Structures are given as structure tokens and as C-alpha cells.
Amino acid sequence: MIIHGNSANMHQIRNEEADFVITSPPYLSDLSYLDWKKPLKKQTEIDRVEKDVVNFALKLKPVFKEIRRILKSGGALVIQTKDLRYGGFIIPLVDLHCDLVRQLGFRLVGRTAWLPKTVRPKLRTKKDAYNISSGFRTLDTEIFLTLTTPEGLKGEKSAKELEKELEKGDDLKVEDIVKPLWITGLGRHGKSNHPDASPIPPVKRFIALFSKKDELVVDPFAGGGTNLWAAKQMNRRFVGYEINRNYVLEAKKLLKIK
């Protein structure tokens, strides 16, 4: 099910009831989002924008406290996040999210970068083809942080089980799961119902890795329900929370629930 409400209070879920939590928190306030969408030449207030990004991230702390409450001992929390590029500079949001959840008792066990197969370098050089220094930038990856409780990961799944569950839509081999960079397609059919919908292949990999059939998967920032849809396709029970009513309606359409 998906619940229209603030995930700082997930009272519908008991203590340590969730087997796995996978989510992507919002990155920007409405004000910073408008700044971020400006043309590059007009992105001139990085100090103010970075301060707002930090303050906005810290406001999500009550949600992460609730995640700590509902996640079973030894369960996994996967957070999709990314560093933000503004005015040619990088705001290190990944480290901010990681530090925030670690302060609440989680322990970091993995960091996976993801790129879509269709990515192309967008290095805008000056007319002098040899002068690329001032226009240097690296490709921007999505980062999936894997964390767990202080007891350490307690999941039990064999390599054979993992490959069997993924074989229908993913050519992943177990030895690839530990690689620091995953490159896949988006895995979507048609237009996404949310501007920041997660890529489906890595989401399915994490669901397969850290949960089993009929176990409970929770997404506290459900958006248009992409993660919940993936969980449903993989025969998991699922609960999502979304504060925006319009996206709740979109998610219900995707999940085919009333």
C-alpha cells in the first residue's frame, strides 16, 4: 500500500517490522530547485544554495529516525542520492546524507555508483580544442548507499538464489554485484510519472539482494511508486509514504490499487 502522509511518523509499521528499506530522499527545497534549474551563467549564489541544501537535508532527520525504528536488526537500508552540480561546482550531498544516517546509528557497508547506458560526456570545451582544463568535469553518477544496523547485515541468500531471481530481466552475475559501478538501462516502460523516478534495474538488484519473497519492503519517500512497483513485481509486500497527494494518485495508478 501507499500512504499519503509524512514518513516522520510511520505508525502503521511496528518496531523492526520492515525487512528492507530502499528510498531516495528529496534533494532540494522548492527555492533551491528554482536556483538549480537556472542557466549555468546565472548560477552565481552557491554559498546560499549550499546552505539551503544542508538545512533541507537536516530537516529529514525525523524520517531517518523512523527508518531506524522500523528496520529489523541486521536489515539493509539503501539510499539513492547524488552530489549536486551548481554553477560549475559540486555540492557534496552524498556525504551529507551518509553522515546524517550514521549519526542515528546506521553503519555504512557499501557505496555503489550508477550510470545509465545512454550517458554521454558533456564536456563543453572552448574553441581551442586543447584547452579543456577550465571546462573539466566528471560524469555525474547516482550513488546508492547501503547501510545497516550495528549488528551487521544478517540476510541469508545464496549466489544461486540471487541469480535465479534476476535472470529474467538482468544479465547480472554475482561477481558483478560487488563492482563499484553499475551501468544499466533505466528499465522504464513509457514516460515516468515522476521527474526523479529511480532506475528500475539497480532497484531490483537491491531488492533481490536484501529481501525475500513475501518480506516487507518500505519506501518512505515513495514519489510515483517506482520502488514499490519493483517490489510488487518481485512478490514482496510493500508500504510507501508520500507527502504529495498528486504523486500518491500516480503511484496508485502504477500499482493498480485503489
Briefly describe each language-model feature range.
Residues 252-258:
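Short, conserved SAM-binding/catalytic segment
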Residues 1-250:
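Core catalytic lobe of class I
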